[in-house]
Amino acid sequence: MRRGGAARGEPPFAVCCAPPLCNNLVAVPAAIIMMMRSLLRFPLVAFPFLLPTQSAWAADISAANTAWMLTATALVLFMTLPGLSLFYGGLVRVRNVLSVLMQCFALTALMSLLWFVAGYSLAFGSSGVEQGPWLGDLGNLFLAAVSMEGNSGDIPESLFVMFQMTFAVITPALIVGGFAERIRFSAMLVFSAAWMLLVYAPVCHWVWGGGWLGSMGLQDFAGGTVVHITAAVAALVAALMLGPRRGFGSVAMPPHNLTMTVTGAGMLWVGWFGFNAGSAVAADGSAAMAMLVTHLSAACGSLAWMTMEWIRHGKPSVLGIVTGMVAGLGTITPASGSVGPAAAVVIGLSAGVICYYATLTLKNRLKIDDSLDVFPVHGVGGILGTLLAGVFCSPNLGIFSGNGFSEGISSIGGQLAVQAT
């Protein structure tokens, strides 16, 4: 072998290795190939250690439902960050934008921690333990009983915890709109923490955790009572106790950036599919129908509010069209698992009209400074949707028929009585 390359006729690798080593390098791959051919002659069951194992826990888990619920959970969190943050941030005056954004961000972090500490246990208790009518048991403080192997139905329990956590995050964030521009950051954190543990978690248990309202047959598929009514009432009470902003009623307080608001509204619309359709806790027809009726109600609420403004002021506004959308979404929330498409159109149109007049009444007649219209949109919408769920769940309304009454109830009157409770 000469310096600078192989001699003519020599193989190229002769420049880098001696012939004995080269023979070994060629022989090793050949031996591996022969061994693999020998293994393939035997059935795989002869080597059980090569077969994938499946635990009893894994057999109880639906991959399809788990995948959908992972997606829905991300969508609901997306509603708060950045959806609701941008929606609210664009509605306030420019000097308060960062304050509102920070409040929504901080609430996401704080509510997540509180849900881990005690919120989930108060709302849902421990698996396999009979729950009381008012509160869940305390066996899941710090999520002590939640493990990787645990399941809730046919999805991992950890995923159910996370999905419900996103609801606990966005509900206090909705209240921010009631006292925006006039509360100290520290006071907001203390109030929100106490409210989540003392109001949200118990009501969540009453409806979804085996409590007294759920046992009565209340139909609240995705949170008309648990989320919208509770948050709206809290926002209204806070607005009354804090009093109006300086200059309210005499100084114009227009939104500072409607582009930001419209962007946030679009995110809310998309995220709401996870909110409502995810509440089916399965990738099935119930989730698909919930998504369809949610979209129809949002569209009809938006058009109805726009039309009311057009009639009253001679032209529609971009703020009106997005607020009507939110009204339609909030109103269909309790009914999204109970009604069909035709009923969803009626619910959306009703939401746009009724919530529009509720907003005018609260601000212009009652002179209540609910900064970002939380009560007339979410509160009135949540109440309206809860009542209409009791009507349109009936299976005897032709094209407007729904999925039926709750167990033990056989008439619209009986279901309405429960819904009104």
Show the residue positions of the predicted features.
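Short N-terminal alpha-helical targeting/association segments
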Residues: 2, 15-16, 156
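A ubiquitous, low-specificity "background" feature that marks scattered single residues
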Residues: 5-6, 16, 29-30, 234, ...
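Cysteine-centered motifs
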Residues: 16-17, 22
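N-terminal secretory/membrane targeting signals
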Residues: 22-58
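Glycine- and aromatic-enriched membrane alpha-helices
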Residues: 57-421
